[in-house]
Amino acid sequence: MMMNAFFPAMALMVLVGCSTPSPVQKAQRVRVDPLRSLNMEALCKDQAAKRYNTGEQKIDVTAFEQFQGSYEMRGYTFRKEQFVCSFDADGHFLHLSMR
C-alpha cells in the first residue's frame, strides 16, 4: 500500500524538477513619435478651448502618459480647471474629461 502512493509522488517530484522557468515578462513601452505627440497636444488644446469657451493660448497641457493601448494628456485652463484628453493607440482623439 505504501509503495502505491510512493511511486506517483516520486514521479511528480521528478517532473516538477524538469520544468523550465517561465520567462520574465516586461511591460511594453512604445516610443511616441514627437510629431504625433505635438499633433495630439494641438488637438487636445483645441478641444479644451472649445469645451471651456476660451482661446487655445490659455490652455496648458502638463502631462502625457501611455496606458494599455491608449494615451492621456492632462492639462488645465487659465482658471485652473483641470481636464484629461484621451486618445486611442493610433493617436485619434477619443474624448475630453473635465476634472
UniProtKB/Swiss-Prot annotation:
It is found in: Cell membrane. GO terms for cellular component: plasma membrane. The keyword Lipoprotein applies. Keywords: Cell membrane, Lipoprotein, Membrane, Palmitate, Signal. It comes from the Bacteria. The keyword tRNA processing does not apply. InterPro entries: YsaB-like. A lipid is attached at C18 (S-diacylglycerol cysteine). It is a lipid-anchor. Residues 1-17 form the signal peptide. This is Uncharacterized lipoprotein YsaB. A lipid is attached at C18 (N-palmitoyl cysteine).
